[in-house]
């Protein structure tokens, strides 16, 4: 189901408790893909994550990488100012993933109390927002390493929010390929 309305900010809030497997701490990441009319990245600069923390005009900002969870209610945030999104960006995809050691079998089921909350705010200075979607990663996506949680689609001068809940067993690398990014 989708909904259309005028909102200033979308706040993507990834949370988890410190969790271990074989004495390794889990690191989760939230990211955003700013997509063109073909549903692809027009440039790798439109992939916002821990190594590229801001879009060109600061319309999308990744606030910092928490490497182990359990520090606060807001472990990792991406803040999207919809009023600043360039016109060539037709949709924004919100992703949660496990930052993993290559070859290891770490899945969301191993990470206690992991969730992704999506909130909206009508005031660009109010980061508390009103939650309208929550994904329980541990329970809903136990056998996955990454998910596309939400797609925000431009509809004229407004935005439409479409929950996706699409899982990827091989992690973020598969999502980057899915959106045409370079690895």
Where are these regions (language model features)?
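Intrinsic-disorder/low-complexity signal
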Residues: 1-183
């Amino acid at each position: 189901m989708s909904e259309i309305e005028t909102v200033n900010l979308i706040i993507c809030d990834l949370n988890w408790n410190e969790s271990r497997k074989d004495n390794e701490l889990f690191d989760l990441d939230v990211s955003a893909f700013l997509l063109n009319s073909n549903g692809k990245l027009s440039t790798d600069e439109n992939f916002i994550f821990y190594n590229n923390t801001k879009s060109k005009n600061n319309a999308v900002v990744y606030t910092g990488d928490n490497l182990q969870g359990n520090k606060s209610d807001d472990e990792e945030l991406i803040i999207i100012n919809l009023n600043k999104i360039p016109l060539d960006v037709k949709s924004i995809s919100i992703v949660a993933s496990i930052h993993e050691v290559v070859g290891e079998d770490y899945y969301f089921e191993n990470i206690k109390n992991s969730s992704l909350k999506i909130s909206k705010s009508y005031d660009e200075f109010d980061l508390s927002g009103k939650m309208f979607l929550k994904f329980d990663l541990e329970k809903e996506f136990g056998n996955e390493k990454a998910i596309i949680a939400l797609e925000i689609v431009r509809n004229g001068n407004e935005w439409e929010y479409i929950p996706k809940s699409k899982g990827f067993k091989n992690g973020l690398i598969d999502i980057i390929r899915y959106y045409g990014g370079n690895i």
